[in-house]
Structure formats: C-alpha cells, structure tokens
Design a protein with these regions (language model features):
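Conserved donor NDP-sugar-binding/catalytic core segment of glycosyltransferases
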Residues: 90-124
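Short aromatic/hydrophobic "clamp" motif used to bind/position activated sugar donors
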Residues: 82
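Glycine-rich, basic loop-to-helix element that forms the pyrophosphate-binding segment
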Residues: 60-77
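Short, well-formed alpha-helical segments that are part of the catalytic scaffolds
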Residues: 14-30
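A recurrent flexible, glycine/aromatic-enriched loop bordering the glycosyltransferase active site
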Residues: 131-152, 208
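A short, conserved alpha-helix in the catalytic core of glycosyltransferases
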Residues: 146-159, 163-191
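Acidic donor-binding segment of Leloir-type glycosyltransferases
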Residues: 25-59
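Non-catalytic, C-terminal membrane-associated alpha-helical segments of glycosyltransferases
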Residues: 211-219, 230-287
Length: 287
C-alpha cells in the first residue's frame, strides 16, 4: 500500500504533557499533519504548540480518556490513514521511511506499526508466529502507543471503545479487527522508542499511579466481560481481587498509606466494573 505525507495524519492524545511532547514532535517529519487532543483543556498549551510547529492543530478537550480522545482526532483528520501515537514515543531517523517501505510490500492492512526498539517489551502479541516476509510479521494485537490505522477498514466509523478510559482499548480494537479477518502487521525494520509511563508531568506521578491502578482493574473486567462473558470475567478477577485485599491490609498494618491507597483503588476499580458502572474515576488536578 502507498503511504506518504498526503494520506497520513498523526494523532496524539496528551494530558499535562508539556515536559515530554516536544521531544516527540521533534522526531516526527515536519511535512506530515498532526492533531493533538489535549485533555486538560489548557489554552496556553495549544497556543505554544501551534506557534512553534507547522502542520499542527491542537484540540482542547475535557478529560475523556485515551479511546474517546483518539476517536476525536481520527474523525477530525481528512486523510486515509491516522497514525495514533503516545507523546512519550520517539521516531528514529528512518522509522517512517522503513514503515512505508514495509507497507509497499503489503496489499492490505487494518493496523500497522514499527517494532519496539526494546526487545524485552515487544509492542505486539501473537498466538502463532506468521512471517509474511523477513521484515513483516502478522500479529494478533498491537500496543496502543503506535498504531497506524487504515480508516477505510472502519466503515462504521467506530474506532476505539469510548467506554474504556484507559488500558486495553487497543486490545479491544485489535480483537475486533482480527474477528473480522482483518490484517495487523509489525514492520521489523522500522524501530520506535517508547519511554513508557512518561506521557504526563512527573510531578503528578503519585496521583496518576492511583488513577492507573483504578482503571487497569476496571478495564480488565470490562474487557473480559465484553469478549468472554460475565462468568469468565469474574473468574479472571478472583486472583487480583484477593491479592489486592491481602495487600491492602498488609500495608495498613505497616502504615504504608500510599501503598494501601493503591490497593484500595484497585479494589474500587474492580467493584465499579462488576457493578456495571462507567469508568468514571478522575483526578482533580489543582495545576
């Protein structure tokens, strides 16, 4: 398939990402369109970025989460392909050129991505290794921090599940496309760096960790229930549920209040998901 600057738009969801977004943007090619969805609604963030970078539009939004915010950007762009990336990734000099070369060897795809530069943390999963060529790997799932999406494969205009605030929204999308017999590929000659856990300002690290634990547990139960049914979801949650209870009381005994709060958040995430409540938990940042 033919990929170029005329048919790809980069989509980046940010939340208080001032300290990291510039490192990401500087590695992206200047002649490609970019849309940033800023979930903190910060007008100064929008003004600063749009003044500094060409071909860039910043949309201000309330804190909708990864799935809903990415959907805004994907639907906003008028190109055939939307390249969803996290603000804590960096392209190498030849990341995009090698991705394009790989795509030229493929007749058709739904989602495509470079491969993680860190082999210990692959950005894909597969049940059986299927190599289309020495450079192209057919996979079951691709991590959400780098997903080149072929919009023509989403004719219903439904991309990420907006019920999910964060975690497993990419797994949900990939499972849907695989069930539809669509193709997902990793291009092995195209490398990408992912810093991991650096997407937001680190001064909010503790609050964000609480948020992540709540939503990780909520999303796991929701995902399993959606794709495998309520009983499977309950069964898969048992170990995490009892482990969180034990650790909650353990950290209460040794007076580690922050760790205790983490496991409280995990329990609350599971409970809310079991009760069918939405992924509502947010942090009220003061600045």
């Amino acid at each position: 398939m033919n990929l170029n600057h005329n048919n790809i738009t980069f989509i980046i969801v940010t939340f208080k990402s001032e300290n990291i977004i510039h490192d990401c943007l500087k590695t992206l090619p200047k002649d490609y369109k970019k849309i940033i969805i800023e979930n903190s609604g910060n007008p100064k963030f929008k003004e600063d970025l749009e003044q500094k970078y060409d071909n860039l539009e910043v949309l201000l939004s309330e804190n909708l989460g990864m799935g809903a915010s990415n959907n805004i950007g994907i639907k906003r762009c008028n190109t055939k392909f939307a390249y969803v990336i996290n603000p804590d990734i960096k392209f190498k000099e030849n990341t995009l050129s090698e991705l394009i070369k790989g795509a030229e060897q493929i007749d058709d795809f739904s989602i495509l991505s470079p491969i993680s530069n860190n082999s210990r943390y692959p950005n894909y999963t597969l049940s059986k290794k299927i190599s289309v060529s020495s450079n192209i790997l057919s996979v079951d799932c691709i991590d959400g921090y780098s997903m080149l999406i072929n919009k023509q494969k989403f004719r219903d205009d439904i991309y990420f599940d907006e019920n999910i605030f964060m975690y497993l929204e990419n797994d949900d999308m990939c499972m849907k496309k695989k069930n539809e017999k669509e193709n997902l590929y990793i291009i092995k000659n195209s490398l990408i760096d992912h810093l991991g856990g650096k997407s937001s300002d680190q001064k909010h690290k503790k609050d964000i960790e609480l948020l992540r634990n709540w939503h990780w547990m909520w999303s796991k139960f929701y995902f399993n229930k959606k794709h495998h049914g309520i009983f499977y979801a309950l069964f898969r949650s048992l170990k995490s549920f009892f482990s969180s209870i034990i650790k909650y009381f353990l950290y209460a005994i040794i007076l580690n209040h922050y760790k205790k709060k983490i496991y409280k958040m995990r329990l609350l995430g599971i409970f809310n998901s079991i009760l069918g409540k939405p992924s509502w938990y947010r942090i009220n940042f003061k600045n």
